[in-house]
Regions:
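Short, surface-exposed connector motifs at secondary-structure boundaries
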Residues: 56-60, 82-88, 136-137
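Mobile-element integrase/transposase regions
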Residues: 1-48
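A short acidic, amphipathic alpha-helical/loop segment
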Residues: 75, 102-104
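Charged alpha-helix within mobile-element recombinases
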Residues: 105-112, 116-180
Length: 180
């Protein structure tokens, strides 16, 4: 029987980050995603969900109108399926909005790793990428009037940036190499 804790979907789908395999940490293959929220103006429900591939650093942004965990899980699942995103694992923080994400992981047939409380450095790729998003949407700015097409443009700009870590290739160049 499942306990009432939403995180505890089962003992095989939702795992602590300490059990994440080393090969995921090495960033050798695409499909291992980090997911986080980017909050807007205080006292507003609207926020962004950022999804970042650990290997290629590809960014996807989703506008979220509510911080409800089931709404968020459904929103992420639908976005991943609609955009045919390659998913092999998911890593998230302990935010309340992600407590039902185990359901999404189970539907996708992947493992969900949750970080330790107050350890955002365990999702460093995501945190670094969120800082790039903040160049376009400063902290405290309302997300209410940001249409998805604007967020897609931000993703395109960030994904098109040459990165020193990749010998000045952009995300799209890397994906061409990986998905030949």
């Amino acid at each position: 029987m499942m306990t009432h804790t939403k995180w505890n979907l089962d003992n095989k789908t939702v795992l602590p980050i300490s059990l994440r395999p080393k090969y995921i940490n090495k960033r050798d293959e695409p499909g291992h995603l980090e997911i986080d929220s980017i909050l807007g103006k205080k006292n507003e429900q609207d926020s962004l969900i950022s999804i970042v591939d650990r290997c290629t650093r590809r960014l996807w942004l989703i506008k979220s109108n509510y911080k409800n965990e089931y709404y968020t899980a459904n929103l992420i699942y639908n976005y991943i399926v609609k955009n045919d995103i390659d998913v092999k694992s998911i890593t998230v923080d302990n935010g309340l909005e992600f407590q039902a994400l185990g359901i999404t992981a189970k539907k996708l047939g992947v493992k969900l790793y949750k970080c330790d409380p107050y350890c955002s450095f365990q999702r460093g790729t995501n945190e670094r990428t969120n800082a790039l998003v903040r160049r376009y949407i400063p902290k405290g700015e309302s997300m209410k009037l940001k249409p998805q097409i604007y967020l897609d443009d931000i993703c395109f700009n960030i994904n098109s940036m040459p990165r020193k870590i990749f010998d000045y290739k952009c995300v799209y160049d890397l994906e061409l190499d990986y998905y030949k």
